Amino acid sequence: MATSAMHHPPIVVLAGATASGKSALAMAIAKKIGAEIISADSRQIYWELTIGAAKPSPKELQEVPHHFINEKHIGEPFTAGDFAVEAWQRITAIHQRDKRVVVAGGSTLYVEGLLKGFANLPSANEAIRQRLETELQTLGSEALYQRLVKLDPTQAATLDATKTQRLIRSLEIIESSGTSVTALKAAQQPPPSHFTFLPFALFLPRETLYQRINQRVDDMMANGLLHEAEALYQTYCDTWQERNLSALRTVGYQELFAYFEGRHSLDEAINLIKQHTRNYAKRQITFFSNHLALRWIEQAEMEEIVEQHGF
């Protein structure tokens, strides 16, 4: 018989920077405690992104059930709010099967939505988005940013003119809903009250993390990232709108797209992937440190906890 809703064991959440070892540790924990894994990675959900998204191997997917891997195609909208709602539903279903849950991933808004809830924002409006993207091309990002400053100064303060996808999404929400993003966020939907989270973030010394990032990029290139990026470029980059699909605005692909267009040499593109990935890791660490109450823990300490207590 399934355990009652009020007596489920806690949900282990393992966040942290890219290349910090979250996925491997999540696998070890899941095998130890008999858990299924929820991937909190906004790129692994797409079928078309494999090497550059650092997906688990087919063998790992066979050994432990994973969720939110290969479930969407590029171009299908899937927001952090969508993830939170579906993740809560799947956690409930996993609990009903008397299984444990491990959440692993570094997508900051996915982890935040899962743990804290999310604002009930309107779904993507393709017509509005395409018009805003055209305005971005013709007017520039600063003009759109100043529009957001007038319409929702609080939301504008959380980003800048370089964050074009968040900028367009903010303006799209305002036009779709007729109200500010800030007002919608104030009516945030919390996670189910009977969920208990054990939220951790995996810590690595910066130099070690950066070495791992550089090595991961080299490994991705050796494993066929160039071929994967070329296939994506030939399939999806005919128009400006396709090129700027959220899924394709991913470190590792954008730099190689620039190489295909002759804007960088291959060596320059690889070095840029490493640099941009290090920058991304730094932003992840800053976000997780400032916005979420996570317990920062080294891998050896986490392994010891699992071995001794099993959560």
Curated annotation (Swiss-Prot):
Positions with a binding annotation for ATP: 16-23
Top EC group: transferase
Molecular function via GO: ATP binding; tRNA dimethylallyltransferase activity
EC annotation from Swiss-Prot or TrEMBL: 2.5.1.75
Cofactor: Mg(2+)
GO biological process: tRNA modification
Alphabetized InterPro entries for the sequence: Dimethylallyltransferase, IPT, P-loop_NTPase
Pfam families noted in UniProt: IPPT (PF01715)
NCBIfam families for the chain: miaA (TIGR00174)
Main function: Catalyzes the transfer of a dimethylallyl group onto the adenine at position 37 in tRNAs that read codons beginning with uridine, leading to the formation of N6-(dimethylallyl)adenosine (i(6)A).
Family, per entry: Belongs to the IPP transferase family.
HAMAP family attached to this UniProt entry: IPP_trans
Annotated protein name in UniProt: tRNA dimethylallyltransferase
Organism: Chlorobium chlorochromatii (strain CaD3)
